[in-house]
From Swiss-Prot:
Natural source organism: Koribacter versatilis (strain Ellin345)
Protein purpose: NAD-binding protein involved in the addition of a carboxymethylaminomethyl (cmnm) group at the wobble position (U34) of certain tRNAs, forming tRNA-cmnm(5)s(2)U34.
Gene: mnmG
Amino acids binding FAD: G13, A14, G15, H16, A17, G18, V125, S190, Q379
GO cellular component, as recorded: cytosol
Residues bound to NAD(+): 282-296
Pfam family, one: GIDA
Protein name stated in the entry: tRNA uridine 5-carboxymethylaminomethyl modification enzyme MnmG
Keyword Acyltransferase included in the entry's annotation: no
Taxonomic lineage of the native organism: Bacteria, Pseudomonadati, Acidobacteriota, Terriglobia, Terriglobales
Length: 649
């Protein structure tokens, strides 16, 4: 058929997933079009004006390491940076940044428009153009995507289509008793495309999410709240960011009161979630304030955070108070909090229901099983959060481009990336609630740290064409610097007199010990040895005209070296365990294996295994509800019971 326009890759939806997908395909040399309902709202932060957080920060680092753009944009517009979980081990350290909401979308648009292979188009996509085919290599696949049809009748041909529509498919907003179709507040829902996907035979379900009210900062008594400052030395998201230059501002901590809780209890019947108006499932780990009060009735107060939405606005995001209660109740609820007695509400909170596609309909490349050349990424796959969306969009865009170029797909292993864990969980087990990433979902999280995301994934980005020469050479130089520093510290022996007084008192006499030996002690850190490092390897600090421009670079690399030294033994153990796990994917589970004998295996897991009786470890890992930890336990006990069997025969 004839098309109005023709592209290699078409991306539908310009949220966080769509931006990554479109940019990836375009940077890989393909003519790409990004379609959105409103070009002025590209990469709009629909909810929290922040990027990162526990595990989410890991995802952003991985997106950056592969050649994505979320990290660089966040670094350019972040107005408060905090490294979370620093009281725990480095495996779970995670960066988070409060962003200037307006500047974020403007910067993202600037980056997208700088790519010559990418065209941004404003139009409503109404339908997919699908061709019936017979493919002997994929007998289950009888259709292939050939392009899209716009509401105005134009047709756009494409060799691959990526759909990243977020909450827009048949979106329905709820605020008290009021409900109306919308993709998010003030924007229309994508009804025609939603119905089109249903007709294609793709299984789906309705999911729900919500957002809190926004307040006018000029009407808030800031003196009543505890100040939550950012880090004095911000940790960037991008490995290519040398220094954070944006002005930094604090957030504030407030608390709900008994009056708040009583007000919610008296009006909970007016909440769509409790009146029966909303039937779909919301995010378990981001509950509404109604949910918190109902499910934790004994809790006297709940913490909330007042977060600025930007440097050029007074709008304040009330983190922790997501709600779909009626507007009059929301206003009274806000006024019941100390310091917010006179606060003016700029926007009310609301809940939104939307269509998602069952992610078990997808292959590991995020291409649909039933329709070839059709890829899905982001909330349409059942996830929640900007970061989860971005990593999926990036992978969908990469694999769509690779397919068009007839090159092998990029499929990451769950032992090398949180991105892979997210995708593997979704396609293997599906989800009936918005999926959120946690570090606890990883079997080998000490290997999946934020500091080594580039070491793990940048070679993949280079292979597919997203890491250009300058960035690649910088990456290689960094790895060489760090390797050389580790070797130098292994050879450098020092005297007690060279140590800072406090450390010398803790260590006692350490004459003749190497720096590596001392760094392995829990009470030491690399900062104490900076002067020694400057003496034995001054080139480590030589980064150009001004060392000050590379402060975060140097600090992060030193910390990464310290982590690899301090946890070397554990890392070696996990490397061996990873090798064993990869080999065991195909390991047969003997018929005689006794699940009840596995210490630490919950009754629920045991019952699932006894009922299904999987034949291999790989099959067991894909049973819905079976955790990676349970699979690891079974894997270990197969070895133990196998040795016992041999000993008795």
């Amino acid at each position: 058929m004839g098309f109005t326009e023709q592209y290699d890759v078409v991306v539908v939806g310009a949220g966080h997933a769509g931006c990554e997908a479109a940019m990836a395909a375009a940077r890989m040399g393909l003519r790409t079009a990004l379609y959105t309902l409103n070009v002025d709202l590209i990469a709009q932060m629909s909810c929290n004006p922040a990027v990162g957080g526990i595990a989410k920060g890991h995802l952003v680092r991985e997106v950056d390491a592969l050649g994505g753009i979320m990290g660089e944009v966040t670094d350019a517009v972040g107005i408060q940076f905090r490294l979370l979980n620093t009281s725990r081990g480095p495996a779970v350290w995670s960066p988070r940044a409060q962003c200037d909401k307006q500047q974020y979308r403007l910067k993202m648009r600037e980056v997208l428009e700088s790519e010559p292979n990418l065209k941004i188009k404003q139009a409503e996509v109404a339908d997919l153009i699908v061709e019936d085919v017979s493919d002997p290599t994929h007998p289950e696949r009888m259709k292939i995507a050939r392009g899209i049809k716009l509401r105005d009748g134009r047709t756009v041909g494409a060799l691959a289509v990526v759909i990243t529509t977020g909450t827009f498919l048949n979106g329905l907003i709820h605020c008290g008793e009021e409900q109306y179709p919308a993709g998010r507040s003030g924007e229309p829902a994508s009804v025609l495309l939603g119905e089109s996907l249903k007709k294609m035979g793709l299984r789906g379900c309705r999911l729900k999410t919500g957002t809190p009210p926004r307040l006018d900062g000029r009407s808030i008594d800031w003196s009543k709240f505890a100040v939550q400052p950012g880090d004095a030395e911000p940790t960037p998201f991008s490995f290519r960011t040398k220094k954070i230059t944006q002005k930094q501002v604090p957030c504030y901590i407030a608390h709900t009161t008994p009056e708040t809780h009583q007000l919610i209890r008296e009006n909970v019947h007016r909440s769509p979630m409790y009146s029966g108006q909303i039937q779909s499932t919301g995010p378990r780990y981001c509950p509404s304030i109604e949910d918190k009060i109902v499910k934790f009735p004994d809790k006297e107060t709940h913490q909330i955070f007042l977060e600025p939405e930007g440097l050029n606005t007074y709008e304040v995001y009330v983190n922790g108070m997501s709600t779909s209660l009626p507007i009059d109740v929301q206003l009274r609820m806000v006024h019941s909090i100390v310091g917010l007695e006179n606060a003016e509400m700029l926007r009310p909170g609301y809940a939104i229901e939307y269509d998602s596609i069952d992610p078990t309909e997808l292959q590991r490349t995020l291409e649909t099983k039933k329709i070839g050349s059709l890829y899905l990424g982001g909330q349409i796959n059942g996830t929640s959060g900007y970061e989860e969306a971005a990593c999926q969009g990036l992978m969908a865009g990469i694999n769509a481009a690779l397919a068009v170029k007839h090159e092998p797909p990029l499929v990451l292993d769950r032992t090398e990336a949180y991105t892979a864990i997210l995708i593997d969980d979704l396609i293997s087990k599906g989800t009936n609630e918005p999926y959120r990433m946690f570090t606890s979902r990883a079997e080998f999280r000490l290997h999946l740290r934020i500091d080594n995301a580039d070491r793990r994934l940048t070679p993949h980005g280079r292979r597919v064409g997203l890491i250009k020469d300058e960035a690649w050479h910088a990456h290689l130089a960094k790895q060489q610097r760090m390797d050389e520093l580790k070797m130098t510290l292994e050879k450098t022996r020092i005297r007690t007199s060279e140590l800072p007084v406090e450390l010398a008192e803790k260590f006692g006499n350490i004459d003749g010990s190497t720096v590596v030996q001392l760094l392995k002690r829990p009470e030491s850190d690399v900062a104490a040895f900076e002067q020694i490092i400057r003496r034995v390897q001054p080139t480590f600090f030589e980064r150009g005209d001004s060392e000050r421009e590379f402060v975060s670079d140097i600090r992060n690399e030193l910390k990464a070296v310290e982590t690899e030294i301090k946890y070397a033994g554990y890392l070696d153990q996990q490397t061996k365990a990873i090798d064993r796990l990869k080999r065991s994917e195909q390991r047969v589970i003997p018929e005689w294996f006794d699940y009840a004998s596995v210490s630490g295996l919950s009754r629920e897991m045991c019952e699932k295994m006894q009922r299904v009786r999987p034949q291999t470890i790989g099959q067991a890992s894909r049973i819905p509800g079976v955790t990676p930890a349970a699979v690891s336990l079974i894997n270990v006990y197969i070895e133990i019971q196998g040795r016992k069997q041999k000993a008795t025969t």
